[in-house]
């Protein structure tokens, strides 16, 4: 703490604080209790909680995209699973480390994602898109940030690369159902270069023999 305090500078006129950062890596320890995971059968006969938050700056085509992929669903659970399956199967994974994906989950980023020829994004963007699609169907959903769990007991070391985002839907009286719309990380887009069309050479009439 003393080292961090020595490296902290504050600009009164800019109302900005700047730190030189820690000299070494920081680590944190915590304990938690994992909630019980519910089976789909527990949610099948329960309607999801209604969403009435009123999202602002929603990317265009979110409503129609959700409607297209939930048209045959008979329950809120089936709607959520249908959207999850669509994104997980038809989408491609790519993070901000590549030229195929931009970081963040702003309106512009999600709008470009769904208007492109193929869905390309990371877990944060897929979770955001799924939550917006569920909201358009009146289903209360939230984006959750966390990490993949390995095992049910004991300690585990987590780093930034272990962080993940997924979606949870509220079912009153039962709990929150978990949905992971992110495609597998090895399901990445490929850039296909079309071969140039061959142009036939014009035929040239040969002069008659003398």
Task: Name these PLM-found stretches.
Residues 13, 46, 105-109, 153, ...:
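Residue-level signal for pocket-adjacent positions within structured domains
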Residues 5-8, 23, 46, 88, ...:
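Alpha-helical structural elements
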Residues 72, 76-165:
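Active-site neighborhood of thiol-dependent amide/isopeptide-bond enzymes
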Residues 8, 39, 50-54, 92-96, ...:
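Juxtamembrane membrane-insertion context
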Residues 4-5, 25, 85, 107, ...:
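Residue-identity detector for glutamine
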Residues 1-73:
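Structured beta-strand-rich cores of soluble
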């Amino acid at each position: 703490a003393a080292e961090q305090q020595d490296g902290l500078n504050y600009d009164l006129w800019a109302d900005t604080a700047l730190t030189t950062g820690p000299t070494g890596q920081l680590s944190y320890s915590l304990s938690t209790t994992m909630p019980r995971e519910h089976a789909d059968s527990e949610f099948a006969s329960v309607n999801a909680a209604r969403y009435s938050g009123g999202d602002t700056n929603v990317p265009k085509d979110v409503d129609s995209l959700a409607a297209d992929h939930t048209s045959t669903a008979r329950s809120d659970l089936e709607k959520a699973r249908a959207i999850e399956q669509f994104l997980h199967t038809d989408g491609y994974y790519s993070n901000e480390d590549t030229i195929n994906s931009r970081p963040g989950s702003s309106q512009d980023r999600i709008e470009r994602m769904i208007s492109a020829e193929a869905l390309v994004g990371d877990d944060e963007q897929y979770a955001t898109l799924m939550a917006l699609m569920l909201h358009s169907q009146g289903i209360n959903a939230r984006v959750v940030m966390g990490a993949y769990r390995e095992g049910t007991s004991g300690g585990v070391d987590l780093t930034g690369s272990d962080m993940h985002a997924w979606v949870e839907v509220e079912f009153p009286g039962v709990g929150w159902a978990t949905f992971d719309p992110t495609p597998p990380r090895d399901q990445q887009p490929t850039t296909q270069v079309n071969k140039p069309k061959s142009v036939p050479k014009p035929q040239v009439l040969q002069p008659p023999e003398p």
